[in-house]
Amino acid sequence: MKVLLYSQKQSMLKKSGIGRAFYHQKRALEAVGIEYTTDPKDTYDLVHVNIAHSNKIKKFRKKYPVIVHGHSTVQDFRRSFAFWRVIAPFFYKHLQNIYGIADLIITPTRYSKFLIESMHVVKSPVVALSNGIDLDAYEYKQENVDAFRKHFDLEPNQKVVIGVGLLFERKGIHDFIEVARTMPNVTFIWFGNLSKLATTHFIRKRIKNKPKNMIMPGYVDGAVIKGAFSGADCVFFPSYEETEGIVVLEGLASKTPVVLRDIPVYYDWLFHKEHVLKGHNNFEFSKLIEKVLHEDQTEMIENGYKIVQDRSIEKIGEGLKQAYQEVIKIKR
């Protein structure tokens, strides 16, 4: 069995969660010995689409079984780019077009599975399978932590809270900014960027007025970001809507306490005080971060790590293998 892992605009994916998911798919297939290609001109037995127009999918379906990866929903498109309200009806139609013609759909969580199955055009099976996490990549390495603290010139005992994501209102960066304002003795760092044209006026204004204890370095990769996850005192992810939240998996894999917004996607696999700390507003977020900074969270951290062990690259590879075998049977 050989798979075409297909995505248009591959060069643009690197800085996004979809880009990391695409990379994880490659690693997962390698882990279970499934041959793949990213070249549509190559030979293969089935197609696993991440990003494509419906016309491209229809073309693939004439010859091959096609899996469409359900990275996006109408819900997680809201409050993202500037002019999202104008684009939303067209985006919804796009989702209908691609999900409605898939032979099988893979999506990261039972929550996103429910949302996709609720679309009246979806007739194919929908499989919930995590985007996965490379546990080895987020293992604690002192040299990464040193690179992180040196990069930002942090004092040895300086408390640090990090957030990661594109500069969408949906990601809750404005709340990250306001929580930072209430904790002037803690350094808050948000990793991620977005072009000014795509950033909403609301977010640009909040960023312009961010407090002095908040740093925004833009997109950072390599040792510095790995060191940030391992070396921070807390990962704070106040997103309003996710299909999974790879940042959350990265925080748990790094064995760093995670504070996040209590939203539906986490309801059935991340529990408050057992794996993470969940809040509903900035007042609660501030209190929870203070709790992380001053109380031992060892038990919660270990419980959280068990969650990502179940979403390791190897286990995702086995899940993909099963999905591929299923779609081949469907197409026969």
Curated annotation (Swiss-Prot):
This is Processive diacylglycerol alpha-glucosyltransferase. One of its GO terms (biological process) is glycerol metabolic process. Its EC number is 2.4.1.208, 2.4.1.337. Activated by the negatively charged lipids phosphatidylglycerol (PG), cardiolipin (CL), nonbilayer-prone 1,3-DAG, 1,2-dioleoylphosphatidylglycerol (DOPG) and 1,2-dioleoylphosphatidylserine (DOPS). Inhibited by 1,2-diacyl-3-O-(alpha-D-galactopyranosyl)-sn-glycerol, 1,2-diacyl-3-O-[6-O-acyl(alpha-D-glucopyranosyl)]-sn-glycerol and 1,2-diacyl-3-O-[alpha-D-glucopyranosyl-(1->2)-O-(6-O-acyl-alpha-D-glucopyranosyl)]-sn-glycerol. It is an enzyme of class 2 (transferase). Pathway: Glycolipid metabolism; diglucosyl-diacylglycerol biosynthesis. CDD domains: GT4_PimA-like.
